[in-house]
Amino acid sequence: MDRSGYFPVLDEDIPTKSELRLPLESKTSSRSRRWLHLVLVLQFVLIISLLASLHILGNRQPSNITCAKQLSPYSPYLEDGDLELEEFTELNHLMQPSPYRGQPTPEIEEAWVRLWRVPMIGFPETKMINLNKTNPQDYAHVSTRYGDDMLGFLNVFHQLHCLNLVRQYTYRDDYDYSNVTAFRAPQELVRGHIDHCIETIRKSIMCASDVTPVVFQLDDSRKSGFKSDFNMRRTCRNFDKIQDWAVANAVQGDFE
């Protein structure tokens, strides 16, 4: 055998196992670093997105319906989401004309009746628990031919009825109210009805507790040098829409 081209292989010329694995391990390490970078970037994006979402949620104003539901017990009107707020400055000085004030006339009486006399409504029996009524069977229902709803009406109309009755009571010697059922009862019951209405109005006012500041306008004609300015800025529920809703959702037919 021709050994002229043969050179002995020395031990140091043979690559070790670790040296043979080096390229593979280098590739693996590089791939791991890329995945780590990707994970860090994704985490960063996620954190930024979360912070942005929290900022948006924290600065978003709740809707009128959301606020109303937090401040009121259950109401089928609020469930329908038809609440509308109005902002305005009312005119309400001491002698401010109004279709609802002054010496009784047929027109004034009719105007008051149109405020509070609306049909009754129905709402689901399952909602009675939201009104803290645990025995629905003890309360009037709509006739079964129209469903199994509870029979009721919105409290604002009871409050207006009470205010009207107190108004009429103050004019009972100046106007013929013989057609008013409440005044045909025995005097003790009439007085009790009026006192009930005064309590209803008192509680309603205290419950709402309007905290809008009343300011004083300078007036040299007054001994005090100023007068209360009752032309106040108001934010109110749109009463016409509430009344329209009650009429549109009126219960028809006989009641049980």
UniProtKB/Swiss-Prot annotation:
It is found in: Membrane. Glycans are attached at residues 64, 132, 179. The chain crosses the membrane at residues 38-58. It is an enzyme of class 1 (oxidoreductase). This is UstYa family oxidase phomYc. One of its GO terms (biological process) is mycotoxin biosynthetic process. It comes from Diaporthe leptostromiformis (Lupinosis disease fungus). Keywords: Glycoprotein, Membrane, Oxidoreductase, Transmembrane, Transmembrane helix, Virulence. Belongs to the ustYa family. Its EC number is 1.-.-.-. Pathway: Mycotoxin biosynthesis. GO terms for molecular function: oxidoreductase activity. A motif (HXXHC 2) lies at residues 193-197. One of its GO terms (cellular component) is membrane. Disruption phenotype: Abolishes the formation of phomopsin A and leads to the accumulation an intermediate with no modified Ile moiety. The 2 HXXHC motifs are conserved in ustYa family proteins and might form active sites. UstYa family oxidase; part of the gene cluster that mediates the biosynthesis of the phomopsins, a group of hexapeptide mycotoxins which infects lupins and causes lupinosis disease in livestock. Within the pathway, phomYc catalyzes the desaturation of the Ile moiety into 2,3-dehydroisoleucine (dIle). The pathway starts with the processing of the precursor phomA by several endopeptidases including kexin proteases as well as the cluster-specific S41 family peptidase phomP1 and the oligopeptidase phomG to produce 10 identical copies of the hexapeptide Tyr-Val-Ile-Pro-Ile-Asp. Signal peptide: none annotated. It is a single-pass membrane protein. A motif (HXXHC 1) lies at residues 158-162. Its main location: membrane. It comes from the Eukaryota. The keyword Transmembrane applies. InterPro entries: UstYa-like.
